[in-house]
């Protein structure tokens, strides 16, 4: 069992939209032998669309909308370990932040992709905050070095300031843009030379940094600048130590170009070597160690309609400890029921295959026909455990959802229920007029919901404006005060889909006045309290 745990690497690739995250995922799959041709995501110039963007709407827009799970085996050159790599490719589009935050609860480490011309962007900052909260180790890949970009030292300073983490370069670019010659691999002390449009790294040369061979290969000026830069790197940044990376104090940095496969294999080789294998998972009752003999796992994502011919849901379960086995009975803790799974699956984006067993770190797809699962559910061999940390954040945009076809109200209801269980958005039912309000993190989610209701559930909806500032979950130890608050604010009170009380404030002023007037009421901005 320990051998199985040791060889697993479960991680997310995260970034701001268009920094090259899906492209990097595809290249990892290419090196892992999972796909023969990587589909460039950009506007589908290539007809083969990216493997990891598989919902119709994603293919149309060239952006990733929901987390894909992919896995492959990989043995680096010269290594005798076959690593089992589980990648979660997350949506970079800011409207899908909820899905991404949740994914970060199911991984042991993360790779952050940064565009070399743009540096750190808003989405990257938000996601890094979640990594910091959870002490998730990160590696940073600075992409698009074959385009004109910013000075590497400036980028490193910005990473340290904006992401609030110390960095340590493990590779260094030799020039950039049209003059880009390659990278010097500090971690392996090799020179990787760049030739555009090739499917593999062309020349890997073991060149001593002070030898004349270096001048011949990259030109005297470039060689002199490289020596100067590396001296500065060693002077400024502490020597790399794996333990400081694993404890999330230091982020190693690599440079390259994902589109041209450049610097990708170096990143992958170093990653599987240094990244942590599955780590302990915090439950409310105790910390669960991966090597415990009994199976435990939690649901971090639910996807409806992977197969449009069957209205079915798949619940994604992260195995936390023990060995998961097909057809074994497991306890669904929230419902107190025993369940067996006859066809658990593993994924390569849309292709899935049935498995007999899975180990800590693996992601297993469990068919969910009757809406059995909710996000955050725990499965065990009988122990009462509740895994923590799958919050919903307070949405920023709100609209009333109305039925546009009275003959299809049942389909609409089913569609809304399934999409909400999937965590696409949040549903609030106003207690005053009983109207349904959908709250999202971004505008695009409204389009996605409308599109999916029509295409997957054959139901039409329309949106109507509602002016709201924030939704906050409220609770109080003083029942009388809580009742008084609900009476006074009754037209602003709603229930979320779990039946919890939510106060819908229509302005920042109203919210701060409510907090002042009702001292014994706690206002929460995430559902995890």
Model-predicted regions and their roles:
Residues 1-529:
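Structural and coupling elements of P-loop NTPases
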């Amino acid at each position: 069992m320990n051998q199985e745990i040791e060889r697993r690497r479960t991680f997310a690739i995260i970034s701001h939209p268009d920094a090259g995250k899906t492209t990097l995922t595809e290249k990892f799959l290419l090196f892992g032998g999972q796909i023969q041709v990587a589909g460039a995501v950009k506007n589908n110039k290539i007809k083969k669309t990216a493997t990891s963007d598989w919902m119709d709407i994603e293919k149309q827009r060239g952006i990733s909308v929901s987390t894909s799970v992919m896995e492959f085996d990989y043995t680096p050159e010269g290594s005798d370990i076959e690593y089992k790599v589980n990648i979660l490719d997350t949506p970079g589009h800011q409207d899908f932040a909820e899905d991404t935050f949740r994914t970060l609860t199911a991984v042991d480490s993360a790779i952050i992709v940064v565009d070399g011309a743009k540096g750190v962007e808003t989405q990257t900052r938000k996601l890094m905050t979640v990594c910091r909260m959870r002490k998730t180790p990160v590696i940073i890949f600075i992409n698009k070095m074959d385009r004109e970009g910013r000075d590497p030292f400036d980028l490193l300073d910005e990473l340290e300031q904006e992401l609030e983490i110390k960095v340590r370069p493990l590779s260094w670019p030799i020039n950039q843009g049209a003059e880009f010659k390659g990278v010097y691999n500090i971690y392996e002390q090799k020179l990787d030379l760049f030739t555009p449009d090739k499917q593999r790294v062309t020349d890997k040369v073991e060149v001593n940094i002070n030898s004349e061979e270096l001048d011949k290969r990259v030109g005297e000026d470039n060689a002199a600048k490289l020596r100067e830069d590396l001296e500065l790197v060693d002077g400024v940044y502490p020597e790399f130590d794996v333990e400081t990376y694993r404890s999330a104090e230091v982020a190693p940095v690599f440079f390259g170009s994902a589109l041209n496969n450049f610097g990708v294999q170096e990143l992958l080789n170093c990653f599987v070597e240094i990244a942590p294998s599955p780590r302990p998972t915090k439950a409310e009752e105790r910390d669960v160690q991966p090597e415990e003999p009994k199976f435990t796992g939690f649901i971090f994502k639910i996807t409806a309609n992977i197969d449009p011919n069957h209205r079915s849901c798949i619940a994604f379960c992260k195995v936390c400890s023990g060995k998961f086995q097909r057809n074994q009975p497991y306890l669904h803790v929230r419902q107190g029921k025993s369940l067996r799974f006859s066809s658990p699956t593993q994924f390569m984006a849309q292709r899935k295959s049935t498995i007999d067993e899975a180990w800590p770190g693996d992601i297993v797809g469990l068919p969910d026909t009757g809406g059995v699962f909710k996000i955050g559910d725990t499965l065990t061999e009988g122990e009462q455990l509740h895994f923590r940390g799958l919050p919903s954040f307070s949405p920023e945009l709100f609209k009333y959802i109305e039925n546009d076809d009275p003959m299809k109200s049942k389909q609409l209801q089913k569609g809304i229920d399934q999409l909400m269980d999937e965590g696409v958005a949040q549903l609030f039912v106003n207690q005053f007029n009983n109207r349904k309000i959908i709250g999202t993190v971004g505008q695009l989610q409204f389009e996605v919901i409308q599109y999916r209701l029509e295409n997957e559930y054959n139901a039409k909806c329309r949106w109507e404006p509602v002016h709201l500032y924030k939704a906050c979950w409220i609770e109080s130890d003083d029942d009388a005060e809580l009742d008084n608050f609900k009476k006074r604010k009754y037209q602003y009170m709603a229930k979320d889909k779990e039946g919890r009380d939510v106060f819908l404030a229509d302005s920042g002023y109203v919210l701060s006045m409510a907090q002042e007037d009702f001292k014994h009421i706690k206002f929460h901005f995430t559902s995890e309290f």
